[in-house]
Amino acid sequence: MKKVAIVGLGWLGMPLAARGWQVTGSKTTLDGVEAARMSGIESYPLRLEPELVCEADDLDALLDVDALVITLPARRSGPGEDFYLQAMQELVDSALAYRIPRIIFTSSTSVYGDAQGVVKENTPRNPVTASGRTLKELEDWLHNLPGTSVDILRLAGLVGPGRHPGRFFAGKTAPDGQHGVNLVHLEDVVGAITLLLQAPKGGHIYNICAPAHPARNVFYPQMTRLLGMAPPHFRDAPDNGKGKIIDGSRICNELGFEYQYPDPLVMPME
């Protein structure tokens, strides 16, 4: 069995550990470390400030693994773009020093910016947000690393326990009601990471997004009704099409992955 380190034992990391992998993980606080250990996960305190802050013995235990999974998102607020980029580079450099042969990094489809139509992995990346630009730069850096094999997963909007999409636009006025949604369930992200951990080699770049893309003006009102919340109102420009549609089929075609929840309208949210 492979031993895997997960940096970012949050709502993505904890379910991955529950899949039965031999896992070490990190949390930023001692309380978080204790909670993870109570759940049966070997966990150690680690902070990125952006330099890596971790006791030497803890770092030895954390990174004595066959693969590293990084699920720390680039924040839209808080410390700037350079902070996140430097922190991730510090972390990966440490992994390389420990000769970890496989790295999986969860990026975001925000790297595509305002692209229209069907978006595949080879679609030019033109991010329009600070976090998207940071992720693009980090992707390029990871892709060119020598001596290791990096998989990059570009995740669509994440939904699942604790992230009910009915709360995203409840009671708000929003544009582009005819545009399709680009969402993926937590369990499918965990499934994709698990599949990559089992693959004989890395170096992949995949979009992870449910195959169905119901219109925003259909999907979000239905989700708010499930929560008993006020539905959103959408402003529609004439003939503005379906917007950006993320194609997440490449991992299916190449590795035989199957989305457990292909349709956002019937995804379990709690």
Region spans (language model):
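Conserved Rossmann-fold cofactor-binding substructure of NAD(P)-dependent oxidoreductases
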Residues: 39, 44-65
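C-terminal amphipathic/interface module of NAD(P)-dependent oxidoreductases
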Residues: 42, 46-50, 239-270
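NAD(P)-cofactor binding segment of oxidoreductase domains
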Residues: 63-104
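Conserved Rossmann-fold NAD(P)-dependent oxidoreductase catalytic core, especially the SDR/UDP-sugar
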Residues: 90-128
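Conserved beta-loop-beta element that borders a ligand/cofactor-binding pocket
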Residues: 108, 137-161
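Glycine/proline-rich active-site loop of Rossmann-fold NAD(P)-dependent oxidoreductases
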Residues: 136, 148, 160-171, 187, ...
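Substrate-positioning beta->alpha
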Residues: 152-155, 164, 174-197
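Mid/C-terminal beta-alpha module of Rossmann-like enzyme folds, strongest
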Residues: 190-195, 199-248
